[in-house]
Amino acid sequence: MSALKDIVELTAKELVDNKDKVRVTEIEGEKTVVIELRVDPAELGKVIGKQGRIARALRTILTAIGRKIGKRVVLEILE
């Protein structure tokens, strides 16, 4: 399991009540890493946050790590 996937999974599980429904998938390409986060639709707002602040913060952290490893990181939050 990669550090990117670990960070997203740990953060999401701390934000939601139904931790069993948190699924994180990592798709790695040559220059890009896509992290897909799936949570219970009823708790989607907890992961996104008010006006998308939590999602934006997560993306900022992933972007910083991505620069260090030389890849573009994309976070997709799915139902």
Swiss-Prot record:
InterPro entries for this protein: KH_dom-like_a/b, KH_sf_prok-type, KhpA
GO cellular component: cytoplasm
Record localization: Cytoplasm
GO molecular function, one term: RNA binding
Keyword Transferase: no
Domain KH: residue ranges: 32-79
Keyword entries, A-Z: Cytoplasm, RNA-binding
Family: Belongs to the KhpA RNA-binding protein family.
Main function: A probable RNA-binding protein.
HAMAP family: KhpA
Protein name: RNA-binding protein KhpA
Organism, scientific name: Aquifex aeolicus (strain VF5)
Gene: khpA
